[in-house]
């Protein structure tokens, strides 16, 4: 029984490690990193979120699922805190939490607010490729 449990644990770890290799790069918003991603003409997602936001919580598993697809391995995801990064929100013309903005390099390709549907979020992310 112990051997089976160990095998299952190692298998799960291996699968998580492999899946993590395909996942998009998530990090808190940093101006220099954002500009570097733009200069490299990478696909970018800005995820404006708040810890108290139920829509943001609903978006999270959808985004995790979609960005784990190998097609998005180069996608840079920057999390923007709605409550504390107000100057940045003004610059980006964001008025609400749960806003998603996609770029391909320096070109904004699309945005949505309050969307939790996997199909439409997938279509939005695809615009960054």
Predicted stretch roles:
Residues 1-9:
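Bacterial N-terminal signal peptides that target proteins for export
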Residues 9-18:
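Bacterial N-terminal signal peptides
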């Amino acid at each position: 029984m112990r051997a089976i449990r160990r095998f299952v644990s190692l298998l799960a770890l291996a699968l998580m490690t492999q899946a993590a290799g395909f996942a998009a790069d998530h990090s808190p918003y940093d101006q220099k990193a954002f500009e570097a991603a733009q200069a490299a003409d990478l696909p970018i997602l800005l995820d404006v979120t708040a810890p108290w936001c139920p829509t943001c919580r609903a978006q999270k598993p959808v985004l995790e699922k979609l960005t784990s697809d190998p097609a998005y391995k180069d996608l840079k995801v920057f999390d923007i805190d709605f409550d504390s990064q107000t100057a940045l929100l003004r610059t980006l013309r964001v008025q609400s939490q749960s806003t998603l903005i996609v770029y391909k390099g320096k070109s904004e390709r699309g945005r949505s607010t309050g969307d939790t549907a996997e199909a439409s979020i997938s279509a939005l992310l695809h615009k960054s490729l």
